[in-house]
């Protein structure tokens, strides 16, 4: 059995750790609340954009746009969202693990034809370990989501797609569903799949608009806005998922510390009782000698 001094030292150490994890949980919870508020403030605008897009797609005429043209994939770009720091459970590990699966799918293209955009220091480190060179430094976006920076990244990807420098763009991120649930999500960013949008037509009555000067001109303005907003939405989504994962990880760590403290307290009391018993036996034995 461990000595009283050893057990007492372990109790103090676990208690200090519990204070740290509890404080980190409160900080992560506050950041999560802020991230959720940012998403809620942005949702009305995003929903309105998608509503307009759905209305246009309900028309009989086919929409023409270079952003919806599918072509043979010879070069692909993957934007991967993670965090700058750890202590958030399997948040980063799951992203990197799934990224390796995607990279295996595109192995036939060659490493030079798979472009990686890592958003977050942890995934940037993972990309480097996998032998790839990042297309830029986007670490700051993971901590402080900015529409301007997300829009700039979207513009760069749109430009490269239009110039046929890349044939497809994918997004890999954690989708925030609740504090306890974050869903690993893989989406095609470019080309835009309008068939998914057209499914909304059957869900309700679509207003009949007269579009001037033409649907194609309006869509030429609308689709880039949708793409910029999509990038920002995913950035906010990943940020909220990170804070949710860290909140849960710190909650679990705090609960485990509480359980360990209870076990150590029982151990300490048993050790103390054993020490007192031994002293009494020594005293009794000495008096009878």
UniProtKB/Swiss-Prot annotation:
One of its GO terms (cellular component) is plasma membrane. It is a peripheral membrane protein. Pfam families: ATP-synt. This is ATP synthase gamma chain. InterPro entries: ATP_synth_F1_ATPase_gsu (IPR035968), ATP_synth_F1_gsu (IPR000131). Keywords: ATP synthesis, Cell inner membrane, Cell membrane, CF(1), Hydrogen ion transport, Ion transport, Membrane, Transport. One of its GO terms (biological process) is proton motive force-driven plasma membrane ATP synthesis. The keyword Membrane applies. GO terms for molecular function: ATP binding; proton-transporting ATP synthase activity, rotational mechanism. It is found in: Cell inner membrane. It comes from Phocaeicola vulgatus (strain ATCC 8482 / DSM 1447 / JCM 5826 / CCUG 4940 / NBRC 14291 / NCTC 11154). Its main location: membrane. The lineage of its organism: Bacteria, Pseudomonadati, Bacteroidota, Bacteroidia, Bacteroidales.
């Amino acid at each position: 059995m461990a000595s009283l001094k050893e057990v007492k030292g372990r109790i103090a150490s676990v208690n200090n750790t519990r204070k740290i994890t509890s404080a980190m949980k409160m900080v992560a919870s506050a950041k999560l609340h802020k991230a959720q508020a940012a998403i809620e403030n942005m949702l009305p605008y995003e929903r309105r954009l998608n509503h307009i897009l759905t209305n246009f797609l309900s028309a009989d005429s086919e929409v023409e746009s270079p952003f919806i043209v599918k072509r043979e994939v010879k070069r692909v770009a993957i934007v991967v969202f993670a965090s700058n720091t750890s202590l958030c459970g399997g948040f980063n590990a799951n992203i990197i693990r799934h990224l390796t699966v995607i990279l295996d799918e595109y192995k036939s293209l060659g490493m030079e034809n798979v472009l990686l955009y890592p958003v977050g220091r942890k995934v940037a480190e993972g990309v480097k370990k996998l032998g790839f060179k990042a297309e830029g430094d986007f670490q700051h976006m993971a901590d402080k989501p900015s529409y301007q920076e997300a829009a700039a990244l979207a513009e760069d990807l749109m430009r490269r797609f239009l110039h046929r420098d890349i044939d497809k763009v994918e997004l890999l991120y954690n989708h925030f569903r609740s504090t306890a649930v974050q869903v690993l999500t893989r989406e095609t960013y470019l080309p835009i799949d309008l068939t998914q949008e057209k499914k909304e037509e059957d869900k309700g009555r679509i207003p009949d608009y007269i579009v001037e000067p033409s649907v194609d001109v309006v869509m030429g303005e609308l689709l880039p806005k949708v793409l910029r907003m999509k990038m920002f939405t995913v950035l906010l989504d990943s940020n909220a998922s990170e804070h949710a994962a860290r909140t849960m990880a710190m909650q679990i760590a705090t609960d485990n510390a509480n359980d360990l403290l209870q076990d150590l307290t029982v151990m300490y009391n048993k050790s103390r009782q054993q020490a007192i018993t031994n002293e009494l036996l020594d005293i009794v034995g000495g008096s009878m000698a």
